[in-house]
Amino acid sequence: MTLQISAQVVKALRDKTGAGMMDCKKALQANNGNEEKALESLRQKGLASANKKSNRTAIEGLLESYIHTGGRIGVLVEVNCETDFVARRPEFQKLAKDIAMQIAASPNVEYVSTQDIPSEIINLEQRVEAGKDDLKNKPVDRIETIIEGRMKKRLKELSLLDQMFIRNQDISIEDLINQNIAVLGENIKIRRFVRFLLGGGEENLKVNFADEVADILNKK
C-alpha cells in the first residue's frame, strides 16, 4: 500500500528544495514520510543529474543585471546553459535574477568557486592566518589543524557557489543550480560576474544590505 503524504508536507519540501511536487511526493513516499531523508535524496538526485551534464558545453544563456534601489550597488553576471530555448525559459531567467541578487548581497564573494581562487591569493591567506597572535604557543600539529579549518572557511567565504541562498538558507547556490539542472535538463554554469559599489567600501553603507536584498527576494 502506497504511503499517503499530505499536500502540505509535499509543499513544504518543495519550498525547501525547489523540486517538482511529484518528485517531492515520490521522495517522501520512498523515505516513509521522513522529510530530512527525502530532502537528502532529492539533493543527491539533483547532484547526479548535474554530474551527468557537467561536461556538456554551455555557451548559450544570458547576461543578467541587478541595480539595487537607490543605485548604490550593481551586479552583472553571465549564466550559461546549452540552448537558447532553455535561456528563454522563465525558470532559467528567474535563476539568473536570483543569482544576480545573491551577488549583490554578498560583499565578500569574489570568485565563482573555490577552484577559481588564484594560488597567490590562497598563499596570502595562509600567511595571514599563520601570523595571527592566537596561534602562538600552540603545538605545531594543532596550529596546522586550526589553519586548515580557517582556510576552508575563508575560501568558502570568497566562493559564490558555497554561499547559502538568501531566499532559502537550507541550500547553497551550488544546490540551487543543481536543482535547476535537474528541472531544465541542461548543464548550467555561472561563467563570471562583477559587482559595483558606488563610492567605495561597504563601510559607507548605513544599512544591512544583505537583509535588504533578502527582503526584496522574499517579496517576489
Swiss-Prot record:
Taxonomic superkingdom: Eukaryota
Protein localization: Plastid, Chloroplast
PROSITE patterns per record: EF_TS_1, EF_TS_2
Pfam families, A to Z: EF_TS (PF00889)
A single GO cellular-component term on record: mitochondrion
GO MF, any single term: translation elongation factor activity
SUPFAM superfamilies in the cross-refs: Elongation factor Ts (EF-Ts), dimerisation domain (SSF54713), UBA-like (SSF46934)
Main location: plastid
Keywords for this protein: Chloroplast, Elongation factor, Plastid, Protein biosynthesis
Role this protein plays: Associates with the EF-Tu.GDP complex and induces the exchange of GDP to GTP. It remains bound to the aminoacyl-tRNA.EF-Tu.GTP complex up to the GTP hydrolysis stage on the ribosome.
Similarity annotation: Belongs to the EF-Ts family.
NCBIfam families associated with the record: tsf
HAMAP family reported in the protein's UniProt record: EF_Ts
The name this protein goes by in its record: Elongation factor Ts, chloroplastic
Species per Swiss-Prot/TrEMBL record: Pyropia yezoensis (Susabi-nori)
